[in-house]
Structures are given as structure tokens and as C-alpha cells.
Design a protein with these regions (language model features):
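Short beta-strand-to-loop acidic/aromatic patch adjacent to the donor-nucleotide binding site
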Residues: 29-42
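Active-site-proximal specificity loops/subdomain of glycosyltransferases
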Residues: 1-23, 27
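Terminal low-complexity segments of carbohydrate-biosynthetic enzymes
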Residues: 184-249
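Active-site donor/metal-binding and catalytic loop motifs
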Residues: 153-156, 160-177
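Short beta-strand-to-loop element that shapes/binds the nucleotide-sugar donor at the catalytic cleft/hinge
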Residues: 61-85
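Acidic donor-binding loop at a coil-to-helix junction in glycosyltransferase catalytic cores
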Residues: 139-146
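A recurrent flexible, glycine/aromatic-enriched loop bordering the glycosyltransferase active site
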Residues: 103-122
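Conserved donor-nucleotide/metal-binding helix-loop-beta segment in metal-dependent transferases, i.e.
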Residues: 44-66
């Protein structure tokens, strides 16, 4: 996709979140809290939990300027379903590494360093949002991308294992269209990290610092995963013509 886009807009994942940050800045708010329209608050103390720990320091003297909660599904589980992936999804599944990371985060202290962001359960202080914006050109995963943006400028995201919402995602009209967005997303992220890591003054973000999840998605291995998944879905899945077009791009 082209790399143009309005930084603040009502279209595009990153631009919409920047709209929220801009509104908070104009109104002089110290904290911005994000809740998506497909998520449900389960606790009347949601906003109290959102601000828990913000502005404080860890025992190592690291400031907590941004933190993420997590979501549970309809069955009250925070983990990805562990049913064996279909053959056509073998190279695109990320359940095991995500669940490994989630197990660690949930069994740690309440506030721990995060490898991920749940954009619909996310809080950030003015100290961070006044310096770091969401990337308006990202096609999907603007929340995880924001973690990279923060790390590039020397800021961390923290995980609060006592703060969560329920995620009720809508039906997906086309898996192929979503896959194409992910293809653009991961290819863009690789190029972005390469450029940032070679830029003087930027903090380097290495895939190994994101183990067990989402490390492999920020490594060159993702190129093969894209090609193999598209090929498998051309052979075995629905929307074969759409996947063939993606494979041939």
C-alpha cells in the first residue's frame, strides 16, 4: 500500500487512535484510555484499574507511562484456542507462542513489562502520548506497532494482569481480505524496523527482545510464512482465487 495517510482522521486504525490522543491533548487530560466498540467492560472499577500504576516507577526506576490490559473471549478465556490449526493455517497460527507469553504475564506480578498491546484495553499518560503517535499507514495491528514506536524512543509498555475486558469480535466477511491486510502489515513492519534500527538516535528493537511472542513475526521468516500460507489456501481453502492473486503479487 502507499505510505500516505492523514495522521488524524476517522478512517484508518492508527489515525482514529490519534484522534483520541489529540482530543485528550486539547482537553488537557493526563491520561488517555482506549476501549474498542467490540469490547465490553466487566467491572465498575474499569477506569480505576486503567490508571493503576500509571505515572509510578518500577523497582528498577523505570517509569510506567503506558500499559495494556487484555481481553477474554466468550468462554472467559484469555488464551487463544488450542485446537490444532487446519493444514491451510499451519504457517499462520500464532497460538502456542501467544499462549506461552500470556501464561507468563498472568503469573507474574500485577505490572510487568509487556511484549504486546491490547488496543481496546490500553491506557497511556500525556508524557508518552505527547511524544509518540500511532502510525497512520499501518493496515492492521496498530496497537502492537505502537509498542514498537514507544520502544524506538526508549519507552516501555507495561502489562496489567488485573485489568481486562470481554472481546466480542464481529463476523469476518472475508478471510482473504484480512490476510492481505496482514501481508502488508508484516512486510511494512519488517521494513520499518530495519530502517529504525539503522537510524542514529533511535533505540534498536530486535525480534529476540519480543520472545516468545510476537518475535517470529518481526523476523525475515515471515516472508516464507506469507508465501506458504497463500499457497496452502489456494490449494485447500475457500476464496482460492483471492489467495492466488495475493500469491502472485
Amino acid at each position: 500500500p502507499g505510505l500516505s495517510g492523514d495522521p488524524i482522521s476517522l478512517r484508518g486504525y492508527g489515525a482514529i487512535r490519534n484522534m483520541g490522543l489529540a482530543a485528550c491533548a486539547v482537553l488537557g487530560h493526563d491520561v488517555a484510555v482506549f476501549l474498542d466498540d467490540d469490547e465490553v467492560v466487566l467491572d465498575e472499577d474499569f477506569l480505576l484499574d486503567a490508571t493503576y500504576g500509571l505515572g509510578m516507577e518500577t523497582r528498577q526506576g523505570l517509569s510506567i507511562y503506558a500499559k495494556s490490559g487484555y481481553f477474554i473471549d466468550r468462554e472467559d478465556s484469555p488464551f487463544a484456542a488450542m485446537d490444532g490449526p487446519r493444514l491451510r493455517d499451519r504457517f499462520w497460527a500464532k497460538r502456542e507462542e501467544f499462549n506461552e507469553w500470556m501464561h507468563r504475564a498472568l503469573s507474574a506480578t500485577r505490572i510487568s513489562r509487556s511484549n504486546s498491546i491490547c488496543g481496546g484495553c490500553f491506557a497511556i499518560t500525556a508524557e508518552a502520548y505527547a511524544s509518540v503517535a500511532f502510525d497512520p499507514t499501518i493496515t492492521r495491528g496498530e496497537d502492537l506497532d505502537y509498542l514498537l514506536n514507544l520502544r524506538m524512543l526508549g519507552l516501555d509498555v507495561w502489562f496489567d494482569n488485573k485489568w481486562h475486558v470481554r472481546h466480542l469480535p464481529p463476523e469476518m466477511p472475508s478471510r482473504a481480505a484480512r490476510f492481505l491486510q496482514d501481508v502488508y502489515r508484516w512486510e511494512y513492519e519488517l521494513a520499518k524496523l530495519d530502517r529504525a534500527n539503522a537510524t542514529i538516535g533511535m533505540h534498536q528493537v530486535r525480534p529476540e527482545s519480543l520472545r516468545p511472542y510476537p518475535a517470529i513475526w518481526f523476523s525475515p521468516e515471515v516472508h516464507a510464512r506469507i508465501a506458504l500460507t497463500a499457497l496452502m489456501r489456494v490449494i485447500f481453502g475457500p476464496e482460492r482465487l483471492a489467495y492466488l492473486r495475493i500469491l502472485l503479487v
